[in-house]
Each structure stands twice: as C-alpha cells, then as structure tokens.
Amino acid sequence: MTFSTQIKAELVQNKLIDKHWNVFLAGFFQNNLKLLYNRNWSFKVQSEALKEQFVQNLKFDFKTKASKKYFLFEFNADINVINTLLKLDVTTSELVVKQVYLIAAFLSGGSVSDLINSNNFHLQISSNNEFQIQQLLKLFSFFKKTVKQNQLVVYLKSYEKICNFLKLIQAFDGYLAFENKQLEKSFTLNQLRKSNLEVANLMKTIRSNNQTNQLQLKSFIKSSSFAKRPLNFQRYCLIKSDHPDWSLEQIANFFFTKYNIKISRSGIQHFSVNLKKLCQ
C-alpha cells in the first residue's frame, strides 16, 4: 500500500462526509465528473471503500462497472442539480465545510510521496478545473500552482506544510506516520553528521600522531644509537621514514625486491614494536 493509498483509506472513513454529503460531491465532481450524453454523467473511483461510500450516499439512479484499476459510476441527473455542485464555492464557509471539500478534492486527485523510498517530501492535488484550483489556493494558502501533463496542480514540498495540511483534513494517522518519518530522517542525518565529525577528528589525530612519529623516527636515525642496531632494523627504519604509509606487506615485499631478503609480516611487525619503544 502506497502512502497516498493509506491516507485516502483513512479519509474515506471520516464521518464528516456523511454529514456534508453535497459538499463532498462538489469537491469530488468538480474534478472527476464527465458528461456522457443528455443527462447522463460518469465518474471513477479507485478504491473499494470509496465505491461503497458512493453506493451508500449517492441519491441518483446509478450503475457501476468494475475494471482492474477503478470502478466506473454512471448516473442520470438534472443538469441544474449538477451545475449547483460544480459551482459550489466553500471559501467563505465554516471550517468543517472547507475540510470536507478538501477531503473530497484529495480523494479525487491527490497524492503524496511514499515514506520509504522518498527523500524529498511532496504532496499534490491535480484537477482539470480552474475554478476548483482557485478554491484550493484560497483554502490552504501554502499551496503553489503549476501544470503537469496538461493538468492543473497545486502542491506542497515543505515537510511542515504537508503536516499542517494532513492535520487540516483530519488524516491524523497519516500525519503521525509522516512525523515519524521526519524524525527518523533527522536522527539519521544527525548520526551521519556526528559520525563524519568523529571520523574527521580521528583522521586529524592520526595525521598528528604520524607527524610526531615521523619527527621522532628522523631524530632516532640521526642519533648515535641508530648505527648500533641490526642492519635489517636500520633498513626498516629508513624504509619507514621514506614511506610512512606503507603496510607491513608492502615493506616485506620491498625487503625482498631491494635486498633479496624474505621477512614475514610478523617480522616487520616486530621491527615496528621495537621502533615505537625506542622512540618513546
């Protein structure tokens, strides 16, 4: 189930729809209704729950057809009755009426980005009705308008504004899921920043220690005690001085290539331990 489907499943169950059915019809029909012929009209719904909502409340004589993607309603109604719905303006109505209209508009043409795979939050309502788009812009002033695929669209990209819209249309479960996703995202980003800072500090420490060790090594090579050490140990010190980042294996390979001497990595490690003791 997508997050859009989850939100719509919650909205369909809102009891306000039954109480303000004509407002709901207006919000839905202003985007979704098509005139077939004479006084015959059609519209589509995509969920079983929304289909049942119309079956229970639609006062017109209707018939339904089911396909794999949607349910098609066809009904007969007087054009004056339909025009009243299509021209309904709720921008100056009480809050509950505005909420029902927005619920219908979202159920008709709304979508929101999925929580799992999306890093950028996006909510939109598409409509082919300029009158409805203008109402949506007034009902929720944070909406911005654009055109996508020959459809008018109002949209939100801000996390806070999407949360506010979900609360306005009483999609409270969706709002909480959205909040939790943002908290997870913020926590992950904070952990990543913290981890990056720790790595950066560690690298600074390592570089500082390496610089100190190199100075101590060069000082030891110049000391009188250096010449008293075994030849291979002296060679190790010189190699380490010239190539401080080499691994044990690289140094062992160099011994074999340069001096034809086989020294195991454990032997090189032994040189390293002795050098650290001498440089302390």
From Swiss-Prot:
InterPro entries linked to this entry? Homing_endonucl (IPR027434), Sporulation_regulator_WhiA (IPR003802), Sporulation_regulator_WhiA_C (IPR023054), WhiA_LAGLIDADG_dom (IPR039518)
Molecular function terms, GO-annotated:
DNA binding
Q: Name one GO biological process term.
A: regulation of sporulation
| A Pfam family hit | HTH_WhiA
Q: Which domain of life is it from?
A: Bacteria
Does the keyword section mention Transmembrane helix?
no
Q: Which family does it belong to?
A: Belongs to the WhiA family.
Q: What role does it play?
A: Involved in cell division and chromosome segregation.
- List the protein's name: Probable cell division protein WhiA
The protein's organism comes out as Mycoplasma genitalium (strain ATCC 33530 / DSM 19775 / NCTC 10195 / G37) (Mycoplasmoides genitalium)
